[in-house]
Amino acid sequence: MGMIRAEKLVFEYDKRDEEGNVIGSHRAIDGVDIDVPQGSFVAILGHNGSGKSTLAKHMNAILVPTGGTMWVDGRDTKDPNELWNIRQSAGMVFQNPDNQIIGTVVEEEVGFGPENLGVPTDEIWKRVENSLRAVGMLERSCLLYTSDAADDMQCVD
């Protein structure tokens, strides 16, 4: 079994009226089979509205299948007890990187991931320092994230 695997994957978005009542559905994914071995690089291509983003959101359990099954590292994305493990195994980079900037300064941005994994604060600061040193940005750790700093942030992202 691959790192990412889907069998007969189906996903439908609900259509709702003004009061929020379900009045129908739109099938965005219809019977997709995919098997991606660990370490592979895969491009998912298609025109607007073809289901690329919907499929990607299944790969880290942001969405769960309406039908069929999606596994990430052997874990079924429909199992609520596996969500934490799945999301540690598979991340997502959004189309516009600025939409995923969390911190206001570089060191906050670098420390965001380990903080969400429950890494102790002292260890986070050590990792932040080591990471910024590794990419030659230690002296810019308190740089505010603005459009002027975008080129520097590309080193961090």
Question: Which residues fall in each region the model found?
Answer:
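Conserved ABC ATPase "signature" region
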Residues: A6, D122-R140
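Conserved small/polar residues in nucleotide/adenosyl-binding loops
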Residues: Y145-D151
